[in-house]
Amino acid sequence: MKITKKSITLLLAGLLCASNSFSQTYPKQDGVIRLLTYNTHYCKGGTDPGSLNDLNTKRFANILKALDADVVALQELDSAANGRWKRVLLDDIAKWSELDYVQVYGIAADYDGGSVGNGTLVKRWLPIKKIKKMKLSSDVGRILIRTDFEDFSFMSTHLDLDDKHRMNEAAAICTELDYIRKPVFLAGDMNDSHRWKNLAFSVFLEDFQIFSDTEGNTIPGREENTACIDYILFHDYKNSGIQNIESHIVRTITIDGQTVDLKDISDHYPVYVDIKIPGMSAIQQTTKNNLE
């Protein structure tokens, strides 16, 4: 076969297209830390009653793998429940994400011989300095998981459906800021929206600013513009200089050349924020790169 300049050009173009089909839909810039919040819906898919099985859990974990976040807040986890074959959902998600996460689980309430709660996943390159789990006032059980790192603190939560409880929980979280001497991120399913008047966000916005994408809704299938309830908020400390590089509510993602509609994975969309921390040392960056 005669090899011409045109055939080489076509070959290179084909290779480029093939490469792009496998590229990450939401690539991370060098030097950023990706924070993510995602309500798992107990890994039963995007509908109710859904199906509790390993396949749905693996599909969920595959989304985490593709998004490659460094710190993750997860809601609606179960652990050792009799009717759910005593699975530990956070363990399963971490294992099947293949990202070697450190796991932090917080029990919100007892459930069927086990428990339900929230979790935080942390890449091993980012050393945890302290963990605090704080019960929030609620009839059904709500918890705040605070994970402290060298340069910031990360709070993970899932607030109540009841308006009064939710406002009390927001006030308790804001009070916790008095005991933290570093910038704080709050991530989770707030069951509340910055678009709603005189509820939890009226409390939060006295101390936090919204860092995450708020374009549209975080619950699939909602036509009205009132279903943005999953957030990552930021409370600065001493003008830290932390930068918000980018944020997205992720509704579709391409994995191995296939587009995945995330409404089929959970009844919430994942939300991420990429941040940069001034002065991240070369040693920290090298450790991050080596472990990833």
What feature does the model see in each segment?
Residues 2-10, 19-95, 110-112, 267, ...:
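N-terminal, active-site-proximal structural segment of metallo-dependent hydrolase catalytic domains
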